[in-house]
Design a protein with these regions (language model features):
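Histidine-acidic metal/acid-base catalytic patches
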Residues: 1-163
Length: 163
């Protein structure tokens, strides 16, 4: 990731987690730290003055889990991990790296990962008129039940999802 960024070859990034199936898991369900590190590389490059135009794409195909619920989970997780990576203290981290204080540098990095940013993300959503709890809002909207009924005939021979 860092090599692609610094080679100015990163055009986009596909989000999914596919350890046990092809694109069937929501982002970060297996290794959220990996996604955090990817976002950290993007933030680091931008902090270094690189102008990135990254296309973020979600590449998932859920067969057992509801597609809408999984998409909302993925977007919410991506928002949280992106914010965590944005909160890394790059100045402190650079100073520790320069002094070769590897353990302390890693703790700065890990400290940002372990921050509970859900209240900040909720505040950001509320300020934009978005549901503070998007998954709850989706489930309470009745949309999933409605679309499931509308599409029931189309998936007579298919998997466990409604779309």
């Amino acid at each position: 990731m860092a090599w692609l960024i610094h080679s100015e070859a990163l055009g986009g990034f596909h989000f999914n987690d596919r350890r046990y199936a092809d694109d069937d898991l929501t982002i970060g369900s297996i290794d959220p730290y990996q996604v955090f590190r990817i976002f950290a590389e993007i933030h680091a490059a931008e902090a270094d003055g690189l102008k990135l135009d990254v296309a973020y794409m979600i590449d998932q195909s859920h067969n057992l889990k509801g597609k809408m619920e999984a998409m909302v989970q993925t977007v919410a997780t991506a928002q949280e991990l992106f914010l965590k990576a944005a909160l890394i203290d790059w100045t402190q981290l650079a100073g520790l790296r320069e002094k070769c204080e590897i353990v302390a540098a890693e703790e700065v990095f890990r400290g940002a990962f372990w921050l509970d940013v859900r209240p900040l993300v909720a505040e950001w959503r509320a300020a934009r008129g978005l549901p503070v709890e998007p998954l709850t809002a989706l489930l309470e909207s009745g949309y999933v039940e409605r679309i499931t009924k509308e599409r029931a005939g189309r998936q007579a021979g298919g998997g466990g999802s409604y779309a």
